[in-house]
A protein has these predicted regions:
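Basic, Lys/Arg- and aromatic-enriched nucleic-acid-binding interface segment
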Residues: 133-140
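A detector for short, charged/polar N-terminal pre-domain segments
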Residues: 1-10
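Alpha-helix N-cap/N′ positions at the starts of helices
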Residues: 10-14, 139
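Flexible glycine-/small-residue-enriched beta->alpha junction loops
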Residues: 129
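N-terminal core-binding DNA-recognition domain of tyrosine recombinases/integrases
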Residues: 13-28, 34-126
Length: 140
């Protein structure tokens, strides 16, 4: 049975309001943040965010890299890893400045949610789009 830490629920609600109202993000962004936080909470067994330690971020990255996509059954793509970890990094950077968390969390600990440079490059690479052409291929 999953347990929710009430203080975590309150700070998440404040963060989602911050994303919507202050940062002017839409529902898809807020939903992505909620999904990333849910994955992290499942991994930590719903521990209080005030007990966050950078070792949790390192271990979570390894755990997430081994997870399978529900639809394809394959490991999560680098883009999915990047999106999840970026949402978590932004949340922990924000929460480190909130009252009640400033003395417990280090702003710099959120940096441990970064992928390696190579993986981040793969995750954010722009794929060349094939555009239609008016030139006919020979022999077609």
């Amino acid at each position: 049975m999953k347990k929710h830490w009430p203080e975590n629920e309150r700070i998440k609600r404040r963060y989602f309001t911050f994303l919507k109202e202050a940062k002017r993000h839409g529902e898809p962004t807020v939903d992505a943040a909620a999904k990333a936080l849910n994955r992290f909470e499942i991994y930590t067994r719903y521990r209080d965010f005030k007990t966050f330690h950078f070792q949790q971020a390192i271990a979570f990255k390894r755990y997430l890299a081994e997870q399978k996509d529900q639809q394809s059954g394959e490991k999560l793509s680098k883009a999915a890893l990047h999106a999840t970890l970026t949402q978590l990094k932004r949340f922990f950077q924000w929460v480190a400045w909130q009252p009640g968390y400033k003395s417990r969390l280090q702003y710099s600990d959120a940096e441990y949610f970064n992928l390696s440079d190579k993986d981040a490059w793969v995750a954010t690479a722009q794929r060349e789009q094939k555009a239609p052409t008016l030139v006919r291929k020979q022999g077609a």
